Structure formats: C-alpha cells, structure tokens
C-alpha cells in the first residue's frame, strides 16, 4: 500500500513542497498520540487564557499549536505561519518559499468528551518582496492554495489532502506510524438526503436561509418530496469528512446574533482548505453569494459564511438565498 511520500512522488509534487507537507504530517502524528492518550497524557481541560478569537483555549489547543509551530519553523522551506491560536503572523525562515496556515485543533469543544476533532491546514506560495511577518502572504484567494488538507483524529487517524490533483485519503497505521493511501480520489455524490447545521442558531438566521432549512425538515410531505436527516458533530473536520465520504451539505450561515461578527468560520484556515478539498472531490463550496475560493481576504482572521457539499444540494440552497 502506497504511503504519503510515494503518493506525492507519483503526483510529481515539488520536493520543497513535499518537505513542508512532511513537517505537517510529523506534527499531526505527535498530536494524534496525545489525543489517543487523553487524560493519561494530562492534555484534557481548559487553560486560563483566550485566543485572538476570544475563545477559551483548551490545553490540547495550545499543545497542538506549539507542536505544529515547532515542526514547521524547523523547515527551511517555510517562510511564515498563521494559526487560529496566534494574533499575528509568525515569521519562520528567511528565504522560505511557502507560508502555512492552520487551525491546530478544530472542534475543541469535543476534546473532553472524546468526540471528533482534527487539524486543518493550507499552504500558499509566499509573495515576492514581502516581509516574512507580513499578513499579505495570507491574503491570497483560496484558488492560489498549493495544498490543503486536514487530519481527523477519530476511531482511526486519517489525512485527507489535495495538492495538484484529486482529494485523497490516507490512514495512519499506529504500529508503523505510516500514513497509507486508502482512497485515491474521493468523490462527493451530486445529491444527498443529509444536512449538517447547528439548529440552536435557528432563531438568528436570516429569513431565506430559515425557509430553506424548514423545507428540509418537512420530509416527504414537503416541497422537497423526500426525507432529510440532520447530522451535527460540532467539528467542521468531522462534518466535512462525512460529506466527502457519503455526500451531504454542511452549512454555517451568517446570522444576526452579533452584528459585528455575522459569520463564524475563518476564511483562511477553515473555509478555504475545506472548499478546495470539496471542489477537487466534485462538490461545491460557496458563501451566500459567491464561490469561496474566489473571495479575496481582507484580514488574517476574517470570517465567512460557508455552504458546501453535494453539488445539486448546494445549488438548491443558493436558489433559496438568491
């Protein structure tokens, strides 16, 4: 069975980019070990600090962030880093060709209940003539990503990745600590009968989106004429992985709860990498008005509405909204 190195070699990925991906792989293997040990490793519970998002940091958030930073900073091909847990860009190595952004541990509310969590990452080529610690490197459209992926720490540890080809899935063998290719090209079904959305926010939704979800819930007797099941993991990695494996639509729309912050998910290291993975698997990924990968970021931690998944269902949702 082919390993990650063999897969990248067959795809003729540039050697320096391969090395950056291997640094992410190494870090995620370390994180996976700590996740598996849980309370035995003393990594559960919260810290007394908040990140730039105003969110209370879990111990494993901080540990995962430190592991990824150390692994990537040790790679001479990495010019700079950006993380959900860091206020600003972190300069790494002068002369590095790539910049890497990541959410070190998505779904951290699931940590203490042994639920699904994961690491999301994206890689861009650094801009010429721009200082290493400049945010400009990261304000590129998502269609400029040279690699995107996530590692899901679940019943098995999986890496889902796309470089310059399909969205592929690799499974970690805990005995050999090797990621082996188990699905060469994931394909999202065009149609679905599953949706993922946080219904607790329904009272804050805009009327058109509320109408769309209401019709999903009506089942066979409603205008959609079929039964839909709702699934919600409170982890973007877990919910998007399900969509990639068997279809569905994942939605985190804008809402009115906080007028200064109408969206929840971050464009750079959540929406963009997931959008690329979904599109390379035949699905669609939009905010409420345009393709996510065509959005030009304005800020490092910019937030955006996300609607992604099976092509026909995303199109139907957008018809309601527009």
Swiss-Prot record:
Query: What cofactor requirement does the entry state?
Result: Mg(2+)
> Pfam families this protein is in?
FBPase, FBPase_C
Extract the GO molecular function terms from the UniProt entry: fructose 1,6-bisphosphate 1-phosphatase activity; magnesium ion binding
The pathway entry for this protein reads as: Carbohydrate biosynthesis; gluconeogenesis
Signal peptide: which range, if any? none
Keywords in alphabetical order = Carbohydrate metabolism, Cytoplasm, Hydrolase, Magnesium, Metal-binding
What does the note under cofactor report?
Binds 2 magnesium ions per subunit.
The record's HAMAP family line, in alphabetical order, gives:
FBPase_class1
Question: Do you know which PANTHER family this protein is assigned to?
Answer: FRUCTOSE-1,6-BISPHOSPHATASE-RELATED, SEDOHEPTULOSE-1,7-BISPHOSPHATASE, CHLOROPLASTIC
Q: What is this protein called?
A: Fructose-1,6-bisphosphatase class 1
Native species of this protein?
A: Saccharophagus degradans (strain 2-40 / ATCC 43961 / DSM 17024)
């Amino acid at each position: 069975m082919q390993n990650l190195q063999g897969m990248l070699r067959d795809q003729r990925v540039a050697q320096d980019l391969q090395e950056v991906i291997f640094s992410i792989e190494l870090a995620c293997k370390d994180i996976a070990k700590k996740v598996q040990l849980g309370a035995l490793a003393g990594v559960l519970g919260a810290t007394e600090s908040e990140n730039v998002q105003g969110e209370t940091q879990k111990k494993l958030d901080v540990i995962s962030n430190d592991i990824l930073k150390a692994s990537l900073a040790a790679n001479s091909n990495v010019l700079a880093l950006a993380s959900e847990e860091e206020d600003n860009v972190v300069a790494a190595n002068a002369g590095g060709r790539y910049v890497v952004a990541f959410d070190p541990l998505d779904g951290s509310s699931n940590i203490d209940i042994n639920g699904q969590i994961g690491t999301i990452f994206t890689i861009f080529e650094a801009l010429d003539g721009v200082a290493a610690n400049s945010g400009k490197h990261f304000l590129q459209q998502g269609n400029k990503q040279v690699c995107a992926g996530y590692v899901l720490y679940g019943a098995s540890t999986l890496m889902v990745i796309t470089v310059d080809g399909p969205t592929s899935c690799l499974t970690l063998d805990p005995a050999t600590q090797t990621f082996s290719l188990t699905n060469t090209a994931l394909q999202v079904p065009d149609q679905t009968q599953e949706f993922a959305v946080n219904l607790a926010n329904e009272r804050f939704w805009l009327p058109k989106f509320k109408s769309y979800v209401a019709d999903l819930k009506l089942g066979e007797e409603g205008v959609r004429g079929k039964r839909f099941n709702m699934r919600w993991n409170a982890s973007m990695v877990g919910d998007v992985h399900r969509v990639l494996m068997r279809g569905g639509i994942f939605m985190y729309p804008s809402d009115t709860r906080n007028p200064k912050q109408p969206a929840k998910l971050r464009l750079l290291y959540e929406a963009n990498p997931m959008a690329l993975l979904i599109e390379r698997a035949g699905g669609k990924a939009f905010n409420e008005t345009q393709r996510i990968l065509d959005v030009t970021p304005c800020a490092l931690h910019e937030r955006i509405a996300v609607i992604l998944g099976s092509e026909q269902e995303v199109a139907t949702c957008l018809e309601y909204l527009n």
